[in-house]
Amino acid sequence: MFQSLIAIDYGKARIGIASGQMITKTATPIGTVEAYDGVPNWIELDKIIKRWNPSDIIIGLPLDTQNFETDITKSAKDFAKEVQQRYQRKVHLINEAYSTREARWRLEEFKSKKISHIKVDALAACVILETWMSEN
């Protein structure tokens, strides 16, 4: 059974992180972890995983609008394998199409005074997690 969950919006410069749980099927943005050409700051990610101790990790898979792989898809898959090996958690991949667009829309809708990349990436991770929870 799922306990707490972590979702990751993988990116080459930043990785958005959200937490959630299946009972209420709600997600909350945690923040972002810096990445350097797709390699995350593992020390920061280690701290987040240790603190939240998720049973499962959901990672957004960047596909195009027709569900074809993009230039970053392979990097995201490699990252997912590394996350699974590093944390020994079940990792689920889910199409993240439109998650960033949805995150930007939510920030604009709620009149967020400053739409920063940090807010967008963490909120995109929420969208990924909410989508996964609604399908499982």
UniProtKB/Swiss-Prot annotation:
Could be a nuclease involved in processing of the 5'-end of pre-16S rRNA. Its EC number is 3.1.-.-. This is Putative pre-16S rRNA nuclease. It comes from Francisella tularensis subsp. mediasiatica (strain FSC147). GO terms for biological process: rRNA 5'-end processing. One of its GO terms (molecular function) is nuclease activity. Keywords: Cytoplasm, Hydrolase, Nuclease, Ribosome biogenesis. It is found in: Cytoplasm. Its main location: cytoplasm. SMART domains: YqgFc (SM00732). GO terms for cellular component: cytosol. InterPro entries: RNaseH-like_sf, YqgF, YqgF/RNaseH-like_dom, YqgF/RNaseH-like_dom_sf. Belongs to the YqgF nuclease family. It holds the Pfam family RuvX. The keyword Nuclease applies. The keyword Cytoplasm applies. Transmembrane segments: none annotated.
